[in-house]
Amino acid sequence: MEHTYQYAWIIPFLPLPVPMLIGVGLLLVPRATKNLRRMWAFPSVLLLSIVMIFSADLSIQQLNGSSIYQYVWSWTINNDFSLEFGYLIDPLTSIMSILITTVGIMVLVYSDNYMSHDQGYLRFFAYMSFSNTSMLGLVTSSNLIQIYIFWELVGMCSYLLIGFWFTRPIAANACQKAFVTNRVGDFGLLLGILGLYWITGSFEFRDLFEIFNNLIYNNRVNSLFVTLCASLLFVGAVAKSAQFPLHIWLPDAMEGPTPISALIHAATMVAAGIFLVARLFPLFTVIPYIMNLISLIGIITVLLGATLALAQKDIKRSLAYSTMSQLGYTMLALGMGSYRAALFHLITHAYSKALLFLGSGSIIHSMETVVGYSPEKSQNMALMGGLTKYAPITKTAFLLGTLSLCGIPPLACFWSKDEILNDSWLYSPIFAIIACSTAGLTAFYMFRMYLLTFEGHLNVHFQNYSGKKNSSFYSISIWGKKETKTINIRKYFCLSTLSTMNDNEKDSYFLKKGYPIHGNVRSMARPLITISHFGNKETFPYPHESDNTMLLPLLVLVLFTLFVGFIGIPFDQEGMDLDILSKWLAPSINLLHPNLSNSVDWYEFITNAIFSVSIAYFGIFIASLLYRPVYSSFQNLELINFFVKMGPNRILWDQLLNIIYNWSYNRGYIDFFYAKTFIRGIRGLAELTHFFDRRVIDGITNGVGVTSFFVGEGIKYVGGGRISSYLFLYLSYVLIFLLISYFLFLNL
């Protein structure tokens, strides 16, 4: 077994030859490299598959042996400072390695077809392989210095991937926003690492945890300083995992290609922050204030992400806010001390979210043939609908991912989310109420996405020619570059109400407003969504199912979504041990909680599951009631009429919905607040500094120079241009200076 561990250092470096060879090929033989560009997908998938097999072997050994292996090389040692580099193989490393490689392989296979017509195909695979290298290096790091190095590389890769279509201003701004926001977290992480080294004198995890715990136990360190250092470390995780208040970069990160979104949101960047907290969990557990802070940030992010996803019309942004909320559940579990539940939800969410993102990519890919290569149109759920007829396989995969995220058994996320909800009741009833309510919101907005996308009719074919309004959209060519084309829009698309409201009244996208059955039934024939005429003349009339190379990863991820949850079934009765995850995590769990038991009996599990599933079904029911296609809603006429005839209460209800809609659609006004305070303040400070530098600093320097120039000119004219005159003036000034110095010396 140890023989296998000795070669684990190669794990991060196996995918590295791909970006290196692509770079060398583009420098030396660019034409041949570009002509044979499709072949680079094979080595990318092959090398990552080797890493996956290696990681699986290590995981099997972890299950059988329950051991932790660490190997280090001394780089520089003296009496005052030592730095060692190495790798650490423990359950957390093996779990993350399998997660990164399996999702990464699916994304690479999917991307071969998705990016086949893009001019940046080679650049895309180089970035993706280097991103996998960076993340694998991060999870195998044995000390904080290595963590920070690979942490920065992961951030750099995310910057490159988000801004992949850098010719589009909105994509360039998005990658800059992600980079700057993560700079805040990275600066906090660096300060926290330096603070911990100042306290313990070590960067190695084992030594650091042991020394730190002894110092805390013996009360030999300032508690305020320790809390500050731990908080700074947590700031890095907050930024990387898009937790409140550093979450603002996440929805803008959707400007990259969809496979990148799947990788970032499932296995790489956002998982890095969760991994950091899990890796430093023995340190955080001895500081109660930090654990409370982690759980507080987690529960705020859970609720905020869910509310912001309610009214999004971009399918990828909706999934982005869903990621934010679900990672909030994971962070909440870590803050509550539920180490196993947190990692369990990280695993189940990663596969479900990868399935949803790749499914959304298949949807976008099919919609591009109808509306053109513009994200504003191909990702807009208002233009979708009825895709079940055109993409049945994608629909089935997306539905399973949706139900999993909603928490419907026996799909993956049900098991992990149910465990977190149960633990939250033991930790704080207030947190539990928020977490359970958000579970219902999750089911609501996820099923809303599904209904708007797949049910009903293809809404892009409903065109409304009333009104005149022009708008300019950035259109994406098949090469990923911006086309400066102005598209005339007769009327900007929106969800129209089904009531007898005047045309001047504000339509709400958040809800299909009431059915005027008691008035004019014929108004039910009006389309649910009014669509503008985008001017796309030469496009296919209908979407189509994706190719097999894009559907294969979806089917594999469907299998993961169906069965990966069974590794964490918390049953251990009558000798039947089904909890593989606890056995896998045994070394870490025993280190943190020696006497912890995760098993529950059937009665307790069923009682808790009925409650959580009921909440999920209630959210699905509300979404079905509000967003189900018009023609299938006639059976609910009596219920709808009840809401329509509410009278004055209906006005209050509409006002409440508009408030919720405005909050959600405007991102909770958080971006607006940051723009008005931090961004404007920093720009004002920069302008003030620029003014001070130009007018004051440069003014003093230039003033001295100008004064010297005029003094010199004056002396030149006094001397008359003769050397004897200059010499006489020089000696005169020297004599005057000596006399002044002499009299001053006498006075002293």
UniProtKB/Swiss-Prot annotation:
Query: Which compartments does it reside in?
Result: Plastid, Chloroplast thylakoid membrane
Q: Name one GO biological process term.
A: ATP synthesis coupled electron transport
- Primary site of residence: plastid
Which InterPro entries does the record match to this protein? NADH_UbQ_OxRdtase_chlpt_su5_C, NADHpl_OxRdtase_5_subgr, ND/Mrp_TM, NU5C-like, Proton_antipo_N
Transmembrane stretches, start-end: 9-29, 40-60, 89-109, 121-140, 147-167, 185-205, 224-244, 258-278, 280-300, 327-347, 354-374, 396-416, 425-445, 551-571, 605-625, 726-746
List the molecular function annotations (GO) for this entry.
NADH dehydrogenase (ubiquinone) activity; quinone binding
Bilayer topology annotation: Multi-pass membrane protein
Q: What class of enzyme is it?
A: translocase
Q: Which GO terms describe its cellular component?
A: chloroplast thylakoid membrane
* Pfam hit, one: Proton_antipo_C
- Name the Enzyme Commission number(s) assigned to this protein: 7.1.1.-
Keyword tags: Chloroplast, Membrane, NAD, NADP, Plastid, Plastoquinone, Quinone, Thylakoid, Translocase, Transmembrane, Transmembrane helix, Transport
What catalytic activity is recorded? a plastoquinone + NADH + (n+1) H(+)(in) = a plastoquinol + NAD(+) + n H(+)(out); a plastoquinone + NADPH + (n+1) H(+)(in) = a plastoquinol + NADP(+) + n H(+)(out)
Identify its protein family: Belongs to the complex I subunit 5 family.
Q: Which PANTHER family match?
A: NADH-UBIQUINONE OXIDOREDUCTASE CHAIN 5 (PTHR42829:SF2)
What is the protein's known function? NDH shuttles electrons from NAD(P)H:plastoquinone, via FMN and iron-sulfur (Fe-S) centers, to quinones in the photosynthetic chain and possibly in a chloroplast respiratory chain. The immediate electron acceptor for the enzyme in this species is believed to be plastoquinone. Couples the redox reaction to proton translocation, and thus conserves the redox energy in a proton gradient.
Q: Report quaternary structure and partners.
A: NDH is composed of at least 16 different subunits, 5 of which are encoded in the nucleus.
State what protein this is by name: NAD(P)H-quinone oxidoreductase subunit 5, chloroplastic
Q: Which organism is it from?
A: Platanus occidentalis (Sycamore)
The gene from which this protein is expressed is: ndhF
